[in-house]
Every structure is written in structure tokens, then in C-alpha cells.
Amino acid sequence: MSVKKIIKSVVAITAVVVSCLNAYGASYTTKAVPVGASKKTYMSYKAITDRTSYQYKLQKRATTGKYGIRTIDGRYCIAVGSYYCTTIGTKLDIVMENGTVVKCVLADGKDNKHTDSSNRLGRNGCIVEFIVDTKSLDKTCKKMGDMSYVSSGGLKGAVKSIRVYDETV
């Protein structure tokens, strides 16, 4: 699906925002994503260079986990568009169409000038950008430019929704 078609479908979609409580009592909001959004790119954690930023401080706490993805408290470090969240350190869950829930934390934000008009998708159609150590990055993901190709298969397919928690790491 082309980015133009995705953007048109975004305009046609009415965002469903529901407040919920998870098993631990933490509240979250479920945010709708454009239909068919499946591209999950990556960026090097070394691209975060402002030593005074919270993003930089979070990366000092992060470790490189499985597939080369940076993690904090067992959550993958990601960047998403401002529609979903802007507070660095916020806990997020990426809910896949196949039912897989990927626990994440907002470790960097996508600049609005690099997203579509709704601030949901990157200009390249990316829904989520994983923050990685490129030296440890899964080889297939590196070749394809998409984290959907991690060997576990847990990131394959379209994203159904994004849960934004009312708590940070």
C-alpha cells in the first residue's frame, strides 16, 4: 500500500481512543493506527547525541538486548509520531494484528516534519522506529531495513493499535 493511500485511509479512520486498566492497575489509552501499517524501521542509539536530553539519559540506562534492540526494564526502546505520545520515558505497548503485545518505551520522538499530516506515520510509511545498536542488529533486519524480519517473527505483520500508559520508566 502506498504512503498516499495510507494517508487517505488515515483521514477516513476515526481514531478510537479508549481508557482501560491493565492487570496491574495502570491505566492506558488505546490509540488506533492507520489500516495496514506494518513497517517498523530502526535507528542507531548513537544518533541521540544531545547529552542534556532525557533521550540521551535514557540510553545511558538502556542495554542492548535480543536482535540488537535497546531495552529499558524489559521494554524495547522506540520512537513514534507525536499523535501517539510525546513524553519521553512513557510506557507503550505495540499490539500486533496477530495478537502479540510488544512492550516498549518511548525513548525518542519522531519530529512532526518527518511524519504524515496526522503525525502517525513516518514519511516512509513507518509506524514504529526501534532504537538499536547497529553492531548487534539482526542481520536480516539490517538487510531489509525493517524490524519485521527479526528471527522470532514476533514483529511480523501489521500493527493493530498502540497502548499509551499513564506511567513512565
Roles of regions detected by a PLM:
Residues M1-Y28:
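Gram-positive cell-envelope targeting signals
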